[in-house]
Amino acid sequence: NILAIGDRECSVQRRHQKIIEIAPSFDLPEKTRLSIQGAAEKLAKSVGYYSLGTFEFLVDSKSQGQEKFAFIEANARLQVEHTVTEEVTGVDLVQSQIEIANGKSLKALELNETPQAIGYAIQARINMETIESDGTVKPTTGELTTYDPPSGPGVRTDGFGYAGFFPSTNYDSLLAKVIVHSARSNFKEASKKCERALSEFRIEGLATNIPFLRGILKSDDFLTRKATPRWVDENAPSLIENSEFETRHILNEQLNPLESGPVSYTHLRAH
């Protein structure tokens, strides 16, 4: 009655805070993946854990098949990035958690074995913040004058906002999450889809980290899956330069819409 639903890659962080998450974890040897899932199941069973939870591990990428990984922590809840697991497995984790709390078994939920992950899913966290060249994060605030999230096949936006909304600075800076799913096992294709979705997200009235996220998604290190938890902090200057280019591009589209072409101007959506 214990089941590992899947795994995620959460290495892209700034100041130890996740900003981009991926499912499934890429370049993870199947033997290591199964060992990690087995460790999570063993731990959950040993403490009599009931409900859904998140078990985090750190993998030594230099171990080369030696399965060196360490347990970090267990969270007795779903994480912000549960969305990418939902997209690649087709399992509604929130609904499943509620049904388990109401007494349903995994068998009743037809969760008899670990679901096969289909393709890649990527989540980008839209935060009300800007990032300086030294990696310093500065929170932003203001009244939203435009809040128009992306949509279309394989594109999901979880968030809250509207024109006239003034987000409180007393809470987390997270404004929205953009989640994309590509059914093909092509990581670069999924990354491009996420970057394109972010480019379609129109937020005006306050600054966000969207340009920075787009810069990351276009980075060669990210696309070749070399990012580690310290990668963003160590490469902040070059990533900032990329994000500044994206900022100028966004402003140019807003100020000169006709020069950007009819699609950018009319902001077409597929439903």
Say what each PLM segment does.
Residues V59-F71, L217-T228:
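Short glycine/threonine-rich loop-to-helix capping motif typified by GTGT followed
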Residues N1-G38, L78-Q95:
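ATP-dependent carboxylate/phosphate-activation module, predominantly the ATP-grasp catalytic core
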Residues N1-E9, K31, S35, L58-F69, ...:
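Phosphate-binding site of ATP-dependent enzymes
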Residues E56-S61, A74, A176-S185:
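Active-site and channel-lining beta-strand-loop segments
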Residues Y49-S51, G65-Q66, L78, I118, ...:
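Short flexible coil/turn linkers enriched for glycine and charged/polar residues
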Residues A40, T83-R269:
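Catalytic cores of soluble metabolic enzymes centered on carboxylation/carboxyl-transfer
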Residues I22-Q64:
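A long amphipathic alpha-helix within ATP-dependent nucleotide-binding catalytic cores
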